[in-house]
A protein has these predicted regions:
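Donor nucleotide-activated moiety binding/catalytic core segment of transferases
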Residues: 82, 119-150
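Catalytic donor nucleotide-activated moiety binding site of glycosyltransferases and closely related
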Residues: 66-70, 89-134
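Secretory-pathway luminal glycosyltransferase catalytic domains
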Residues: 1-94
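A donor-sugar binding/catalytic signature common to diverse glycosyltransferases
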Residues: 140-171
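Aromatic-acidic/polar surface patches that form glycan- and anion
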Residues: 77, 102, 136-139, 154
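Non-transmembrane alpha-helical segments in soluble domains
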Residues: 85-92, 114, 150, 166
Length: 171
């Protein structure tokens, strides 16, 4: 209710932002309201260092790949592994120097892509998959910022995570 009471012209009032506590956790699969403003998304210094450690290897070209497998049946049905592989192969045909940042919740998918595209996959191999843990949330943010730093995103159908990364990048 607080959000609805403080919303005018499709955006939240400045007073509402100022009244927020220092840290806010938002859990949703939908946009709150039509907005492409991600200026409030500011990574902590620790997260930014982790993002920088991965993105330094993105040059000269990096395509983000988001493969969601464990909890989104719609995504799994529409975004097959074969489709991801075909898209990645097309990228390499057009741009052989391309590397891929892989964000996935399925280790088998990562293992398959690493064997299919040796030396081309960048990912957080020490990630925590449990999205309900603090470490898992931190790793998800790392993936989100790295996807948003890529030149292009090949993402999962019906995934707000893919959509948010693309919006953050302006893709």
């Amino acid at each position: 209710d607080d959000i609805l009471n403080n919303k005018t012209d499709g955006t939240l009032n400045d007073n509402f932002y100022r009244a927020l506590k220092k840290r806010v956790y938002i859990f949703t699969w939908e946009h709150f309201y039509p907005s492409k403003d991600y200026s409030l998304f500011v990574p902590t210094d620790a997260l930014q260092k982790r993002v920088d450690a991965f993105t330094k290897d993105f040059a000269p070209r990096c395509v983000g790949v988001h493969i969601r497998r464990t909890d989104n049946a719609v995504s799994m049905g529409k975004s097959t592994t074969e489709q991801f592989i075909a898209e990645m192969e097309q990228e390499l045909l057009a741009h052989p120097e391309t590397r891929f940042f892989l964000a996935t919740d399925d280790q088998r998918e990562e293992d398959l892509l690493r064997s299919r595209f040796p030396g081309k996959i960048i990912s957080n191999q020490s990630r925590t998959i449990d999205r309900n843990s603090v470490a898992g949330m931190h790793d998800a943010l790392l993936d989100l910022y790295c996807l948003a730093a890529s030149d292009k995103i090949i993402g999962s159908y019906w995934s707000s995570f893919t959509d948010t990364a693309a919006d953050m990048r302006g893709i």
